[in-house]
C-alpha cells in the first residue's frame, strides 16, 4: 500500500478527493431540491396539531 503513495502526492490526492466529494454532495442536494417530494425549501407548510 505504501508504494501507491510513492506514485501519487498525498496532498494533491486528498485535496482532489475532498473537492470531488464536495461537488458530488452539491449535485445530490440540487437534484433533491429539483423534485417535488424532497424539496424542503418550497415544500408544503407544516400542519398544526
UniProtKB/Swiss-Prot annotation:
<dbReference type="Pfam" id="PF00556">
    <property type="entry name" value="LHC"/>
</dbReference>
<comment type="subunit">
    <text>The core complex is formed by different alpha and beta chains, binding bacteriochlorophyll molecules, and arranged most probably in tetrameric structures disposed around the reaction center. The non-pigmented gamma chains may constitute additional components.</text>
</comment>
<keyword id="KW-1003">Cell membrane</keyword>
<dbReference type="InterPro" id="IPR018332">
    <property type="entry name" value="Antenna_alpha"/>
</dbReference>
<keyword id="KW-0076">Bacteriochlorophyll</keyword>
<keyword id="KW-0157">Chromophore</keyword>
<dbReference type="GO" id="GO:0045156">
    <property type="term" value="F:electron transporter, transferring electrons within the cyclic electron transport pathway of photosynthesis activity"/>
</dbReference>
<dbReference type="InterPro" id="IPR000066">
    <property type="entry name" value="Antenna_a/b"/>
</dbReference>
<dbReference type="GO" id="GO:0046872">
    <property type="term" value="F:metal ion binding"/>
</dbReference>
<keyword id="KW-0479">Metal-binding</keyword>
<feature type="topological domain" description="Cytoplasmic">
    <location>
        <begin position="1"/>
        <end position="12"/>
    </location>
</feature>
<keyword id="KW-0148">Chlorophyll</keyword>
<comment type="function">
    <text>Antenna complexes are light-harvesting systems, which transfer the excitation energy to the reaction centers.</text>
</comment>
<keyword id="KW-0812">Transmembrane</keyword>
<feature type="transmembrane region" description="Helical">
    <location>
        <begin position="13"/>
        <end position="33"/>
    </location>
</feature>
<keyword id="KW-0472">Membrane</keyword>
<dbReference type="InterPro" id="IPR002361">
    <property type="entry name" value="Antenna_alpha_CS"/>
</dbReference>
<dbReference type="InterPro" id="IPR035889">
    <property type="entry name" value="Light-harvesting_complex"/>
</dbReference>
<dbReference type="GO" id="GO:0019684">
    <property type="term" value="P:photosynthesis, light reaction"/>
</dbReference>
<protein>
    <recommendedName>
        <fullName>Light-harvesting protein B-880 alpha chain</fullName>
    </recommendedName>
</protein>
<keyword id="KW-1133">Transmembrane helix</keyword>
<feature type="topological domain" description="Periplasmic">
    <location>
        <begin position="34"/>
        <end position="49"/>
    </location>
</feature>
<keyword id="KW-0997">Cell inner membrane</keyword>
<keyword id="KW-0042">Antenna complex</keyword>
<dbReference type="GO" id="GO:0042314">
    <property type="term" value="F:bacteriochlorophyll binding"/>
</dbReference>
<dbReference type="GO" id="GO:0030077">
    <property type="term" value="C:plasma membrane light-harvesting complex"/>
</dbReference>
<dbReference type="GO" id="GO:0019866">
    <property type="term" value="C:organelle inner membrane"/>
</dbReference>
<feature type="binding site" description="axial binding residue">
    <location>
        <position position="29"/>
    </location>
    <ligand>
        <name>a bacteriochlorophyll</name>
    </ligand>
</feature>
<dbReference type="GO" id="GO:0005886">
    <property type="term" value="C:plasma membrane"/>
</dbReference>
<comment type="similarity">
    <text>Belongs to the antenna complex alpha subunit family.</text>
</comment>
<keyword id="KW-0437">Light-harvesting polypeptide</keyword>
<keyword id="KW-0460">Magnesium</keyword>
Amino acid at each position: 500500500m505504501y508504494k501507491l503513495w510513492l506514485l501519487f502526492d498525498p496532498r494533491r490526492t486528498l485535496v482532489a478527493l475532498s473537492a470531488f466529494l464536495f461537488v458530488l454532495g452539491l449535485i445530490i442536494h440540487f437534484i433533491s431540491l429539483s423534485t417535488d417530494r424532497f424539496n424542503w425549501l418550497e415544500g408544503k407548510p407544516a400542519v398544526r396539531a
